[in-house]
UniProtKB/Swiss-Prot annotation:
The gene is esyt3. Belongs to the extended synaptotagmin family. This is Extended synaptotagmin-3. It comes from the Eukaryota. Residues 672-682, 691-714 have a biased composition (Low complexity). The chain crosses the membrane at residues 67-91, 92-112. The SMP-LTD domain is a barrel-like domain that binds glycerophospholipids in its interior. It comes from Xenopus tropicalis. One of its GO terms (cellular component) is plasma membrane. Residues 17-28, 41-58 have a biased composition (Basic and acidic residues).
Length: 889
């Protein structure tokens, strides 16, 4: 390549042109120059426009007639060629006497191929548009799955500065990858097969679009203080173009790749010396999404069915190295052992009891829904790459399964339980609902037995019992085996083997050799074996990767087995040669031997039977007892179980303002209590308090009764908590209009409104980390305004402000002819915990009046500020109802 002129002259050979196999490699660059310009992905090679976008001068007399003739011939020949291509398959069918079915099959195949190709190009183009202008894509409104993570999740931070750094480095990364493909990958492919001697990369171009990190989430709670955990929302919508050629007529390539996933980066252990981090560990929590646009002969991979198979094969290759439980570890210090970081012990085991479901939607309808049938439901349960499918219950909308499954949980937080329900059909299974449960809350509560409502469907819920099993190195915690339930877990870290025989002729075991030679004949050879390990415990068998051409193989893999009976089960291991299918060594280890070892662990070299005299295999075998531990006292009922213990009583403040309020309210309450004492149930404030506050609050209430309150009264009213205008301004300026909204609904000057408060509503609020949603429980109301001679027909309406859309409206059932209704109804708002703290609940109590009735409609409302309380712990309070929702004082 000619050296570039410092004066800015045009180089003789433009950069980025396709490389021919016989062309020399150009490695020299102008001193101090940056990355050389490349051809655009779809541009013509060797042609460049002058600076400023102006075209060069053209002589109108040169080639004008020739170009016009060429355009005319092209316009006539293109329709003719298209007609010939369309009719040629018809001619072939008639020429060879094939059935017209083959023609129809080819037509449908071509239609599906073009449809799949069009959709894939549309997805890539949409991703490129979002890459070019992310702000425009967010403001104009895209689907949630297309938006960056920082838009949907407030706890995910936007790191645009990091994307700018990657974008600045991307051309140089492209140069390195291009050189690596040509200098390393190409010779390896050529040497792998005699048919690939002419294999050549004709073009390697990573494109202009670089991988982006849409957000970073850091974990600071419930994690080890000696590590830093980051989740990177990785998104690559690349215009990469790679073309290969084996022979002149055999060309293939890739033009456009999409890769999306959550990459977890762990910096651990933290050290007091440089470089302060012992190692960097990276892995994908879930299998990433991959979409490849093939070109050339590989276009056949775009055929429906084949495309899914090819993409899944590539994802499987990525998963074997970078998806849990596999990890990629880069040691940064000699003080740490990389093997311990690559294969840490699992966090625990989740035992899931799939009990039943109810109120599922019917999918087997007939005559376009005129005749409604039922469904044949089954459940698919998933944590990471572990999948289980339940049995199918025929024609039942309230199926009962009664099945149990066990999952190995490697990362918490990070991994979630996914439950999908489907209706089994001969052609395509119909969707019945889904459910995602975060495992952090299960790990805190230890045992969760709950009905979970299904998402994305009008109705349906599933009953699950979740048990978190800790891994304990204590043999005394070992329980008896019963009912197929696992009592322990065996983790095997397969390291390496040494002094393996090349074949079965090198060791003397006449019985084993004679048994094998009855069915096979081996050829004695001095070639080193391609060895792999086959391990089994009970009915489960696993196979390691194959190490080629070595008598000292190194596998470096980990496997886990569930153990039902430690005293009866064995670990059986066999080293085999994949090429000759002969055994190179065996090991049988009774598991009860591990019970006498320290921490139930054996880390040593085990001698192999039926092998060479010095053949050994190095493994670390860890036995852990599965046990449900009691929850920690400070975390009792902080997960999904927190609302099961009823409301927590709140101590009233000893202020003069509350005293005067208590006097006026007590008189009003006693007047209603004498009238309705025989019909009103005991208020929910009298229910059993939570375990964590029972003793303390019982002693406080018995020794220091609140003033103006009868200790024997059942209608004690805790302090009402209502928001002030100051937090209202902090949440959002748009919420300042709530006062005007309330004024338009309620008329404060209406003489029908009493001067004191107009009743109370009891609300329980908690953020469910399992469901990642805000749970609001409307318990009851009391002392409501009488709207007619029969009392009122009250119901409660809820908004999560500032959202006042009809779709976000929640409403309880109507209670007839009562001023003290009991609801006990639960509602959920899908919102993150950080976002929930910025919101406010609008709870209004209304009277269900008939059409044309002149009865009162609004009974009062309250605005609940969610930023003042710990939402994870939750709270239950009585709130006074006012016309505007603001406090009366």
């Amino acid at each position: 390549m000619a050296q570039g002129d410092p004066g800015g002259q045009t180089p003789q050979a433009p950069q980025g042109t396709d490389k021919k196999p016989d062309e020399p490699k150009a490695t020299e660059k102008p001193q101090g120059a940056g990355p050389q310009p490349r051809d655009p992905p779809g541009g013509e090679k060797g042609l460049r426009d002058p600076p400023g976008g102006e075209k060069g001068p053209r002589d109108p007399g040169q080639g004008g007639a020739g170009e016009a003739l060429a355009e005319a011939l092209y316009g006539l020949g293109r329709p003719v060629l298209r007609a010939v291509l369309y009719l040629f398959p018809v001619y072939l069918c008639g020429r060879f006497g094939l059935s017209p079915t083959w023609l129809l099959f080819g037509l449908f195949l071509w239609m599906f191929w073009t449809r799949n190709k069009k959709f894939k190009l549309a997805r890539i183009q949409a991703a490129w548009d979002l890459h070019e202008n992310e702000k425009l894509g967010v403001t104009r409104g895209l689907y949630l799955q297309q938006l960056p993570a920082w838009v949907n999740f407030p706890d995910v931070e936007r790191v645009e500065w990091l994307n700018k750094v990657v974008g600045q480095m991307w051309p140089y990364i492209g140069m390195y990858v291009e050189k690596m493909f040509q200098d390393k990958v190409e010779p390896l492919v050529r040497s792998s097969s005699a048919h690939l001697k002419a294999f050549t990369f004709t073009k390697v171009h990573l494109g202009e679009k670089f991988p982006r990190i849409n957000g970073v989430k850091s974990y600071t709670k419930n994690v080890d203080k000696r590590e830093v955990i980051l989740d990177l929302q990785l998104s690559y919508n690349g215009d990469v173009e790679i073309n290969v050629e084996v022979k002149k007529m055999c060309k293939a390539g890739v033009k456009g790749v999409q890769l999306h996933g959550t990459l977890r980066v762990i910096l651990a252990p933290l050290l007091p010396d440089l470089p302060f981090v012992g190692a960097v560990t990276m892995f994908f929590i879930q299998r990433p999404h991959l979409d490849i646009n093939w070109t050339g002969l590989t276009n056949v991979l775009e055929i429906p069915g084949v495309s899914d198979f090819s993409d899944s094969m590539i994802v499987d290759m990525i998963a074997s190295h970078l998806v849990l439980p596999n990890r990629f570890t880069v040691p940064l210090s000699s003080q740490v052992q990389a093997a311990q970081l690559r294969f840490p012990l699992p966090h625990g085991v989740l035992r899931l009891h799939l009990i039943e479901a109810e109120d599922l939607i019917p999918k087997d309808n007939y005559l376009k829904g005129i005749i409604r049938g039922k469904s044949d439901p089954y459940a698919v349960l998933r944590i990471g790459n572990q999948n289980f499918k339940s049995r199918t219950i025929k024609e039942n909308l309230n199926p009962k399964w009664g099945e149990m499954y066990e999952f190995v949980v490697h990362e918490v937080p990070g991994q979630d339980l996914e439950v999908d329900l489907y209706d089994e059909d001969p052609d395509k299974d119909d969707f019945l609902g889904s459910l995602v449960i975060g495992l952090e809350g299960v790990m805190q509560d230890r045992v969760v037995d709950e009905w979970f409502p299904l998402s994305d469907v009008p109705s349906g819920s599933v009953h699950l019992r979740l048990e978190w099993l800790s891994l304990l190195p204590k043999s005394e915690k070992l329980s008896e085996a019963k009912g197929g339930i696992s009592t322990a877990m065996l983790i095997v870290y397969l390291d390496s083997a040494s002094a393996l025989p090349r074949n079965h002729f090198e060791y003397s075991s006449s019985e084993y050799t004679t048994r094998k030679q009855r069915h096979m004949t081996y050829t004695k050879t001095d070639k080193d074996p391609n060895s792999y390990v086959l391990m089994s415990v009970g009915k489960k068998s696993v196979k390691s990767k194959t190490c080629t051409g070595s008598t000292e193989p190194v596998w470096g893999q980990a496997f886990a087995f569930f153990i039902q009976d430690v005293h009866m089960q064995h670990l059986h291991l066999e080293v085999k040669d994949s090429e000759r299918q002969c055994a190179l060594g065996m090991l049988d280890l009774p598991l009860h031997r591990l019970l006498g070892n320290e921490e139930l662990t054996a880390d040593q070299r085990f001698p192999l039977a039926n092998s060479g005299p010095n053949s050994t295999i190095k493994m670390k075998i860890v036995l852990r007892v599965l046990h449900v531990e009691a929850p920690e006292p400070e975390s009792i009922y902080t997960g999904i179980n927190s609302l099961k213990q009823g409301p927590v009583s709140i101590k009233r403040a000893q202020s003069q303002q509350h005293k005067s309020h208590g006097k006026s309210h007590q008189a009003h309450h006693q007047a209603h209590q004498t009238q309705q004492n025989h019909t009103v149930q005991q208020p929910k404030a009298e229910r059993k308090e939570s375990i964590s506050t029972t003793s303390q609050q019982a002693n406080t209430s018995s020794s220091n009764p609140a003033p103006n309150q009868n200790p024997n009264s059942t209608g004690a009213v805790p302090e009402s908590h209502t928001p002030s205008l100051k937090p209202l301004e902090r949440i959002a300026p748009s919420l300042l209009s709530l006062n005007s909204i309330g004024s338009s609904v309620f008329d404060p000057n209406d003489k029908r409104w009493p001067s004191e408060m107009t009743g109370e509503v009891e609300v329980s609020v908690r953020y469910a980390s399992l469901r990642r949603c805000l749970v609001v429980l409307i318990n009851s109301c009391r002392n409501l305004i009488q709207c007619s001679s029969n009392g009122a027909d009250p119901y409660v309406r809820i908004y999560l402000l500032p959202d006042r859309k009809w779709s976000g409206r929640k409403k309880t059932s109507v209670k007839r002819k009562t001023l003290n209704p009991q609801y006990n109804e639960r509602f959920e708002f899908l919102v993150s915990q950080e976002e929930a703290k910025k919101r406010m609940l609008d709870v209004a109590v209304k009277n269900n009046r008939g059409f044309g009735s002149h009865e009162r409609k609004e009974l009062g409302k309250v605005l609940v500020d969610l930023s003042c309380d710990d939402l994870v712990k939750g709270f239950t309070k009585w709130f006074e109802l006012t016309p505007t929702g603001l406090p009366t004082s």
